[in-house]
Structures are given as C-alpha cells and as structure tokens.
C-alpha cells in the first residue's frame, strides 16, 4: 500500500488512534520506518535470551524470516546490499530512520541529503538482525540456517566498512545519499555502529574518541550532531539536541 507504505514482512512505524488519526499520514497505521523491521528481529532474539516462552518465540520465527526477506526484497531498493528508504508518496515521512525530521540527514556543510538514503545505523541493525536470527536458528536446531545468516552478516559488514568508513575524518558516514555519496557529518548515529557490532575493531578507539570529544559530548549526553557541523543547532529536533536513548 503506497499510502501507508505497508509491504510484506515490514514492521509498522506507528499506530495512531482517535477521530483524526487518518489525517496525519494517510491512515491509523503507518509503515514508513526503515529501522523497525531489523530491530524486531533483534528484539526477538533478546527476548529469547531473557527467557521468553519457547513456543512463543518459535511461533514468531516466520515473522522474523519475513522481516529479513523484506530487507532484501524491498529494503534494498537497488541491489547494492544496503537498506535504503524513500517515501512512496508526498504524504509520508521524508526521512525514515529514527531521525525522521525533514532536515535530520545532512552533510557536514549543512546541505540536506537526497533520498534514497542508506543510514549507517540501519546497516548495523540489519547486521545484528542477521546474527540474531542465526542465534535463534542454532537454539532451535537449524544449523544450516544459522550458517547462512552468519555468512550474510559477514558480507554486509565488509560492504559497510568499505563504503561508509571515512579515513580522513575518522568516523563512519552518517549515510549514503541518492548518488551513493557518503554523508560526511559527525553524528550520534555513529554510536549505534558500536552497539550493533558492525564497526571494525580497529575503528573502535577513534570512534570513541570522536564521540567523547567536546563537539559531541555535551556533559549530560551525546549531541545528535557535532557543534562543528554546518546544520548544528542545539534547539533543533535532530541537529544538536540530546536524546536519552543515544
């Protein structure tokens, strides 16, 4: 459905209730999020680790497989191995990662990136989702499935490191834009690459140094965008504010 952006296997972005819910994004349910689907697979494995009921987890494995299938069939729009987003209509969200404000994805100069956009953290989520599904496969007696997903994760990580690392700056690009140009701003998204494990071991120390620098660390949290970037504004929604989940 192009209005709600629903696709097979895709996890919804939000559910709105109330008399005017359909007036916002075309309906009470909206699927325009590029990150919710791999995060669902990660969450299922995390629930299993914390002792979720075996039968419930087993019953959700087909949904996890459908989510991973969405990533390759619909999320990867141009077969380059990365998950990208671009809204299907002029009613949807322009940006569909967690920084979903219209100006949330921009270059170091402040220029706004044009979609389709492949976010660094979303590639990390997909990497972690593949490993999560491999872990579940091992737990439920599916060794061949586990090997397949681990191989896919390793291939994604290699592609990511080749395409996103900016050696002259010492951080990963925030994203790749419509022309596959690295969006070179220094942002908190970088930290998600550490969390998911997609970052290379040899990059970890310099990334930690960048994130703990004065331009990123406000003293009470990480800024969403470094003070040295062209679009920095401490009062903005995603271009300098501090979000607790970061």
PLM features per residue range, with description:
Residues 1, 41, 45-48, 58-72, ...:
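Hydrophobic core segments within long, regular secondary-structure runs in both alpha-
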Residues 1-30, 77-118, 155-245:
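Extended glycan-interaction surfaces of carbohydrate-active proteins
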Residues 31-42, 59-63, 117-128, 185-188, ...:
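Aromatic- and histidine-enriched alpha-helix N-cap/loop-to-helix transition segments
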Residues 24-26, 39-56, 70, 122-143, ...:
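Well-ordered alpha-helical scaffold segments within catalytic/enzyme domains
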Residues 48-62, 76-83:
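Short secondary-structure capping/junction motifs at helix and strand boundaries
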Residues 34, 52, 169:
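Single, functionally critical "micro-switch" positions that shape active/binding sites
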Residues 114-120, 124, 128-159, 170-171, ...:
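C-terminal transactivation domains of fungal Zn(2)-Cys(6)
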């Amino acid at each position: 459905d192009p209005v709600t952006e629903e696709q097979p296997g895709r996890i919804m972005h939000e559910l709105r209730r109330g008399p005017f819910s359909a007036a916002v994004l075309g309906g009470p349910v909206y699927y325009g999020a590029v990150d919710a689907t791999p995060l669902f697979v990660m969450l299922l494995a995390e629930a299993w680790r914390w002792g979720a009921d075996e039968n419930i987890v087993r019953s959700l494995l087909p949904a996890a497989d459908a989510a991973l299938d969405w990533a390759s069939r619909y999320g990867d729009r141009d077969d380059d191995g990365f998950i990208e987003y671009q809204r299907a209509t002029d009613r949807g969200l322009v940006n569909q990662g967690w920084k979903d404000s219209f100006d949330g994805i921009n270059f170091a100069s402040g220029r706004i990136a044009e979609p389709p956009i492949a976010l660094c953290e979303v590639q990390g989520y997909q990497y972690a989702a593949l490993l999560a599904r491999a872990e579940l496969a091992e737990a439920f007696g599916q060794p061949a499935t586990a090997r397949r997903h681990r191989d896919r994760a390793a291939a994604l990580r290699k592609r990511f490191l080749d395409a996103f690392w900016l050696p002259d700056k010492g951080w990963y690009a925030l994203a790749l834009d419509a022309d596959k140009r690295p969006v070179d701003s220094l942002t908190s998204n970088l930290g998600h690459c550490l969390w998911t494990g997609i970052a290379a071991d040899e990059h970890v120390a310099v990334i930690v140094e960048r994130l703990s620098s004065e331009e990123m660390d406000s003293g009470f949290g990480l800024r969403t965008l470094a003070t040295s970037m062209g679009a920095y504004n401490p009062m903005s929604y995603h271009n300098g504010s501090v979000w607790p989940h970061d």
